[in-house]
Structure formats: C-alpha cells, structure tokens
Amino acid sequence: MSKKINRNDPCWCGSGRKYKVCHEMFDDKIAKIAHQGHIVPTHNLIKNAEQIEKIKESAKINIAVLDEIQKTIHEGMSTAEIDKIVYDMTTDMGGIPAPLNYEGFPYSVCTSVNDQVCHGFPSPDVILKSGDIINVDCSTILNGYFSDSSRMFCIGDVSPEKKKLVDVTKEAMLKGLEQVKPWGFLGDMGQAVHDYVSVSYTHLRAHETRHD
C-alpha cells in the first residue's frame, strides 16, 4: 500500500477531499485484510469515478464492435475478415485494438474456433463452417483506458453437445458475476463458476493463460 498520509491531507484518490473523510476507513479495512494474509490491490489499481467513466467509454466501443460482429458473422466467412472488421470499426470510433502489436501479436482480435480454448490467431485460411462455434475476444484502448470482453457465436446448425457447452459456459459466467461485489474475493467468482460447471461436466479446463 502507499505511504501513510496525514488525516487532513488531500486523499490519494484525487477527489480533493480530506483523507479522513474519503479513503481512510477504506485503507484501514484493506490493511486488516492484508494482515490476514490476503493479496490486496495497490492504490493505482483502485479507480475513481472519473476513471471508471473513461473505462466505460472504452467499453462502449468494445461492445459496439462485438455487436457488429454478431450482425455480420456467417458461414463461409474467414476469421481474417473478422479481424478486419474489428480493426476498422475500433479505429473509426477513435479507439485502438489492444492486442495489435502487443508483444509482437499481429492481429486486432483473437478468434478461437471449436476446441481451441482461447487466444486463437485470425487467418484467411480458417473459414467458418456450419456447426462451428467461435469465440471472438475483443479488447479496446480509448484515451489510455482498456476494456475487454468476448462473445461466443454458433454458426449454422450446431450439435447439441456444442450448444450445451456454449449455454453452460454463459450461465457459469453469470454465476461468477453474481460474486463480483465490494470486498468480495476473486476466488469467490472462480468457485461459483467451478461449482456450476461441475454439475454439467466432469472435466474442467484447469490451467490456461490468465489475465492479471
């Protein structure tokens, strides 16, 4: 955590209010949680109201792009075409595709088809067929603020097994989101997802690249 400041100093969050009437009680609670051995966020990870609004503005582009993909995705389309739509629409709206050129990644989006778990590379050689399921993972930067979301799409006639996978995954995500609340733990979200999916599937993907 940050160095202790005086109670009458301006709060570290930038609100202009005195620390004692702004984040002092918050920091005291964080300190108690840290003392119990839990990992706690540093001040720079805690966003104020203005920063949250800027993240929401970034997310508006991100969601608009996914909505456009939902309208246009179809059998016979290549995943490279999806990448172009994402790049064109994101930049037209004033944003930057976050994956593009990140550590050399040459695409604006990740496209994962069927049994590809995540972070697939778009390609003109990957043509969507009836029966495919595809995850389109989209991330946007707007004025330095990031947003990130993905969406699953079913192409044409999808088998009951694949449809079940998509439906269970969506419901599991919603169960996890129910646990996103002030002073909750990320582990609560993961546990809710695990518990729900375990009812439908005996095998879970236990290890994968994570977002910190």
Each predicted region: which residue ranges?
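Acidic/negatively charged segments and metal-coordination signatures
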Residues: 1-45
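Acidic/histidine-enriched ion/cofactor-binding microenvironments in catalytic or ligand-binding pockets
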Residues: 47, 112-145, 210
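Intrinsically disordered, low-complexity, positively charged segments
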Residues: 45-91
